[in-house]
């Protein structure tokens, strides 16, 4: 094996993304047609392409949608599920309701979305999996090499296999990256971890020394720092703190035996749980209970998220007078861009609630809250599936695999399948979606309405210090900046601010997000890169050279110097190094996982906004309006003083995507929500507008 010092020298040679020049001949046909596949829970997307969309016009269906041929037989959930939102380090599980009522609105904890299996997708449940976990002991121990030895240090792999060059993406803006974090936080949060700041469980001392096994907490899985680390060796850091995710074996869940399965404490659905919370108790803490509104606090003429009651605990604050927010998700304060979008989504709820109240003054608080929430979620799903996901998965891929449809504006897509498990896949949350950390930019520009750069912020200075967005005109300036500044290219480079300075507080260095991603892969016992390649219909590699179809020779040499065997390559690592599929922002292995996940997320959601159920759905006129929702409109309606935006806010400004007045950007006409039973002649000319 090559010495660690030599490997680190390789890391400094500046090899960047040779893989980006490779082309994948299979195009969007990610999965080969395998009717005899040994993976019964996989939907086989190349086969999906042969199925006709089930699109219905303005009348509701009189017969059920055709059965999805790729779903596994219905089976009861194998674990107990709970409803409480745990603090870091704890998880509380409870059984789902024995009986579900069919109501017009989602529950807050995700229960009863599937009426016959009410625990599917609920908060505090197990992640799903595509492949059996690969624990070292078959039960819960982190993954090891096929030789029985430990795998190479996650930090070493981060340094050698991944660069840190600044390569802006000419096509996509920082809002594209930031919306991805919104979706990530909405779908997944590992039990037992803060995931946004310094963890209370210490596996390393404050000066970076490893705590002995005899005194370390049982959940410790510290990342070993190589002795000649180009950053941490300057301050003598020997390890990076890492705490394992809690599983069904660690909690009071009804453990069913077999390998441990990690728990997620948020709902699996795209339901804006990060805005509304994952339980009645959590939601009650952030609701105003008047006019259907959520709590906001007014300062300096603007409306903000409510302040935390534990400022020094929730934020990296020196004293309790600093701005620190509370919301439906404890990670709200993690970075300025995230806090801005959570504020915008909260303001959007209240904007809708106020408009509905004016249109339907007979509505009580509960009806206004639920209707505003329902519309807010529908707009969010429209933006996510029809504006954001095509950038990542490719529009052609999504159409072929029935994630989106070219349907008439008022037509329903009745594709809900009660046999589809909507649970977030471990391979998705722990590996595939984390690849897009490469889009993070360490410099955040502040722009005027004329798009002149007024200044910039350094990301690591403002982790868990969100108060900067309330200073002066920073809220609008950062919002414009994120809509104008390019994100980092989706490649093998990770910005220095997250590779050496993550959550650094007042220290010279912080943690390394790419190292954390790799270590989490091993903590969760994810199947190897080679196993997942085969699962997704690619050729299994029988030697290092077998990876050459998707990974460039220089990168393969780096991997060979790191791993004892080609069978050891972590999924998070190998799939991140693949050449991208044309038209998408990922290689075929991650694209396979992402496509599978977002198919399940859509088809496994009874409340998905395009479904035409008479009780849970929208009218054809309302659905036609919801399809006008856009990221640009969301920003225009909920900034402080934003008056212009490009129509496609996830894409950089160009001749085909110019900055235009907000008044020219289509908006959802909320007058379509007038209760016709009581108000047949309301003059609605100004309702629903800013």
UniProtKB/Swiss-Prot annotation:
PROSITE patterns attached to this UniProt entry: PEROXIDASE_3
Keywords of the record: Disulfide bond, Glycoprotein, Heme, Hydrogen peroxide, Iron, Metal-binding, Oxidoreductase, Peroxidase, Secreted, Signal
Q: How is the cofactor bound?
A: Binds 1 heme b (iron(II)-protoporphyrin IX) group per subunit.
Q: One GO term of the cellular component aspect?
A: extracellular region
Q: Which GO terms describe its molecular function?
A: heme binding; lactoperoxidase activity; metal ion binding; peroxidase activity
User: Mind telling me what this protein is named?
Assistant: Peroxidase
Iron as a keyword of this entry, yes or no, is yes
Compartments, record wording: Secreted
Glycosylation (residues): 310
Q: Which residues form the signal peptide?
A: 1-20
